[in-house]
Amino acid sequence: MPASDPRRLRSPLNPSIHSPFVIRQLPFEMDFSATASLPIGFSSLFLLTEVYIRHVESSRRRDISLLSNCWYIAVNTGLWICCLVLSIVALVLRIEAVSLSSCQLAWMQAAVLKASDAQLWQPSADQLQVYHLRILLFLPGESSWPYGVLALVLTACLQCAAAGLCVWDAAPGLTPHLTRSALVPILHVGWGLHYTVFLLWILRICSLKGNDLRHIWKWRVWCLLVAPLFISALVGATPLTLWYPPKITFLFWCRKQQMRWRMLGERGAVQSLRSVSSTVRAQPTSHPYPAAL
């Protein structure tokens, strides 16, 4: 087929079809800067919540300082730095998947908020613990690192790896096929763990009764933790659309249906012509004029 033939296949005008993780034109006139900045707000809010809870604990107990259990504060600070870096990368390179990964890392900070060691939890000591993720999901017991917390840490590592692969996929001159073949299962497993733990946490909240249930519905709890978690879960509901954006998917579906209808119409027309021709052949031929007697 010559190069001047208009039927010759050409590369798509939108290069993001080959690199769907790079957002060059946002659908629905979305403000990507505001979307990518949300994880920074969540992460900063969780870090301030951690410091606030430590302050409340130190003010209630004289034998506990503000910097008690510095390990959890350090983990929150590390997650905040990673979230900040990923958000900046998402803003500069305009990669939506990196923004989702930073949102997931911000949600990860809820797992280490006031996560006590293997000690029995006393509601009278600190009522703020009633909505913490580790207290709600896992009873303090034999191990100081329950399987749920390990799953959350693994989720954070997977999201960091996915963000790195997204940046690699966005770099020019690289083959995206190998990158995407590793990126797709990593994102699937990471978000699968994320939503599994999130649903277990919601079920645990729904099973609370008495004073614990009344404490959950306080506005302070919703402002500090529950509302940002719900928002991050809603934001995280879009990772599957990164490979096939809704607009492109809808257009491909419409084109496929149009081709299917056209093929069905052509097949029906061919069948009708065949039936007409067979009917004409089956009828006896008669002379248009009567035979002369």
From Swiss-Prot:
Broad class of the protein's primary localization: membrane
Entry keyword set: Membrane, Transmembrane, Transmembrane helix, Virulence
Induction: Expression is up-regulated more than 10 fold in toxin producing cultures.
Compartments it resides in: Membrane
Entry annotated with the keyword Lyase: no
Gene Ontology CC annotation, any one: membrane
UniProt pathway: Mycotoxin biosynthesis
Record bears the keyword Glycoprotein: no
Membrane topology category: Multi-pass membrane protein
Spans through the membrane: 33-53, 73-93, 148-168, 183-203, 221-241
Miscellaneous section: Gene clusters encoding host-selective toxins (HSTs) are localized on conditionally dispensable chromosomes (CDCs), also called supernumerary chromosomes, where they are present in multiple copies. The CDCs are not essential for saprophytic growth but controls host-selective pathogenicity.
Functional summary from the UniProt entry: Part of the gene clusters that mediate the biosynthesis of AM-toxins, host-selective toxins (HSTs) causing Alternaria blotch on apple, a worldwide distributed disease. AM-toxins are cyclic depsipeptides containing the 3 residues 2-hydroxy-isovaleric acid (2-HIV), dehydroalanine, L-alanine which are common for all 3 AM-toxins I to III. The fourth precursor is L-alpha-amino-methoxyphenyl-valeric acid (L-Amv) for AM-toxin I, L-alpha-amino-phenyl-valeric acid (L-Apv) for AM-toxin II, and L-alpha-amino-hydroxyphenyl-valeric acid (L-Ahv) for AM-toxin III.
Name of this chain's protein: AM-toxin biosynthesis protein 14
Source species of the chain: Alternaria alternata (Alternaria rot fungus)
